[in-house]
Each structure stands twice: as C-alpha cells, then as structure tokens.
Amino acid sequence: IKDLLEAERLYKTLPSAQQWQPNKRTSLPMVHLLLSRAYLYMEEWEKAATYANHVITNGNFHLLDLNTIKTYSEEDPSIPSYINYHSYTTSSEVIWVYGNITDVTKYVYNASASTNDHPFFRASKELMNCFDETENDLRKERYVIRSKFQIINEDNELEAMPSAFGKINVSSKAYYQPVATNDAFGRSLRLSEAYLNFCEAKAMLYKAGVANAGQEALNTLNEFRRFRFPL
C-alpha cells in the first residue's frame, strides 16, 4: 500500500495529459485500480470504493458495449468473429496491458495448426451454464472462444468446443488458435474491474450499516449490466 500511495502522489505531480497514455506504461488510473483491489482484500470498503470511483469517473475510459460487438464475420455470417479485449485499439476499457498470450494459453491449448490436434482443456459445463442463468447474457458468445475442434456435448450433440481461454487475440484462419504478436497481450487491467470493486465495496458497507450504500451498489451494477446484456 505504501508504494502505491507514493506512486499516486508522484503521478499527481504530472500534467493530467501525462497521467495516462495508451502506451503500455504504468499510470495513475492503474495505481488507483490496484489500490481499489488491495483495499478490497484488506476489507477497507470505503477506500476500495473511493479508488474504484476514481477509475470509473476517469474520462479516458468507457465501458465497452457488447451490443456493438459482432459475433460473426461481415464477409461470411457463418464464420464466428472474436476481438481482442486486451487492446487499447479495440476496447475503451483497457487501462494497462501486460502478459504474453503464449504464457496465458500454453497449458490449455496445443498451438499446432491442425484440426487433428486437441486442445488440452475446455470451458467447463458449470461455467457455460452460469451464462445461461440470465437470459441473453452477451458475454457467452463474445468472451468464450469456440475452436474449430468439435466435441460431443452432454446432450449428445456435436458442437464447436468452448475453449478454456477467452478475450485474447485469435486467428480465424488457424482454427481460432491464440496468436501472439508484438502488440497483442494476454491480460490487462480494465475499467470493468473498477465497477465490480465499487459494487462489492458498497454492498459490504451496506451490510455494515451504511444505509445508502446498498442503492449505490445496485445503481452501479445496473449501469454495468447495460453494457453486457441486450438493450
């Protein structure tokens, strides 16, 4: 915490235009998000909510509306389409990018460009069912990447296997395998975490007796949901 607070102090000495830039470097909103996460772990709910709100109200970031993300190729509607959610250019939520795609996926996917090679793992039935608990959850088709490797599911139906990874850069020409490039990263700190941190912190404050905190949590959660479910 001490180091993060010192980093916050130093970043605030910079002009606002230099406190964050989409250049893969650390920044003030990155520090704010990490402080929110740390205070949440420490159960210091008010501080967690305060720092999460700093990120939420930062004008550099906006929730990405999944209603606007196509799930198929415009050239051929039969071909699924996925975007990289850990990219400054494709997601307005990204605060900081990090991590090699190969490091993220090498233990769950065989990178050989052949339909005969099997992925090591698939997204669990329990996870997939979670998306079905709420009607028309947009995250299922946009976050969970379907490989061209087909499986027989629990209903004895043939389906494209849901991969044990998502949100990353993949190739439609190589069986939707992960593609590592100099500008493609496997992980990122994103605005969406700030929303979840804020909601959890406010919910815990409500549980502790802060009367208006519950409504704040609900309002923020409903605002977040507008970008993850059909309009």
Label the predicted regions:
Residues 1-108, 132-231:
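Acidic/polar-rich alpha-helix caps and helix-coil junctions
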Residues 108-120:
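Active-site-adjacent substrate-recognition loops and nearby beta-strands
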Residues 117-140:
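Short, cationic low-complexity segments
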